[in-house]
Regions:
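Cytosol-facing boundaries of transmembrane alpha helices in integral membrane proteins
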Residues: 1-231
Length: 231
């Protein structure tokens, strides 16, 4: 259903100079080293120091802070919204809708004016649907792709959360004619519904080099969107 049960954050401290210790600042709880036996000592105000011994440090911990993008998943059977638990074992036409809400809002100056902008995220959602249960599988136009190996339908959906709002805020709604979706849908006919794991990954790196305040960048955005959807 997309309800959050636990938030785990992973950090990678690169030790390119081979230092004996690495200082970091974190507000994570239950911090643990996930790729070595290096230890750390805690200081004040979230400061920690890792005994790196020349190595990179990979650690993770939990947080109760808001995620930069919230994911809502809604399930329908024959047009009626239903929980996946209630859908288990049933047959009919199924629709699964993923919605992405960007919460990473901040204020920046554009042409001397304070403007609310988002950190744009590329959201990739993937799942595998067994071909003996799911037929006539379709995905949202322009925002997904289906790959079949005969036994399974492999689904990949792409969404660009916060990007359209940034472009509209930077250039004006009348100058942005790109169809950028913040949702993704799958429809299919199903026999004996069951669903294995779905995976959603978000990254802000894809558009990190694009200046939304440049008209030329809009062409770059269109090209990048097309490349990701067609990949």
């Amino acid at each position: 259903s997309g309800n959050v049960q636990k938030k785990i954050v992973s950090d990678w401290l690169k030790n390119k100079d081979g230092k004996d210790t690495i200082a970091d600042k974190t507000d994570l709880k239950n911090v643990e080293n996930v790729k070595g036996d290096e230890t750390y000592t805690e200081g004040n105000q979230g400061n920690i120091e890792w005994k790196a011994n020349g190595s990179d440090i990979y650690y993770q911990g939990t947080t109760d802070k808001e995620l930069p993008v919230n994911v809502k998943v809604t399930y329908y059977l024959d047009g009626k919204e239903m929980s996946p638990e209630d859908m288990a074992g049933k047959s009919g036409q199924v629709k699964i809708r993923f919605e992405y809400e960007n919460t990473a809002k901040h204020t920046v100056k554009i042409n001397g004016k304070d403007t609310e902008m988002y950190t744009p995220f590329t959201m990739l959602t993937g799942m595998i649907l067994p071909a003996d249960k799911f037929t006539d599988v379709e995905v949202s136009d322009g925002s997904g792709k289906i790959v079949s190996d005969g036994n399974n339908e492999m689904i990949l959906g792409v969404s660009f959360s916060g990007l359209k709002e940034d472009l509209e805020n930077a250039k004006g709604k009348d100058k942005v004619n790109i169809d950028i979706s913040d949702s993704f849908e799958i429809t299919a006919n199903v026999n004996d519904f069951s669903l294995a794991m779905t995976l959603t990954v978000g990254t802000s790196d894809v558009f990190s080099g694009i200046d939304v305040d440049s008209l030329d960048s809009i062409d770059d955005v269109e090209d990048t969107i097309d490349e990701l959807v067609d990949a």
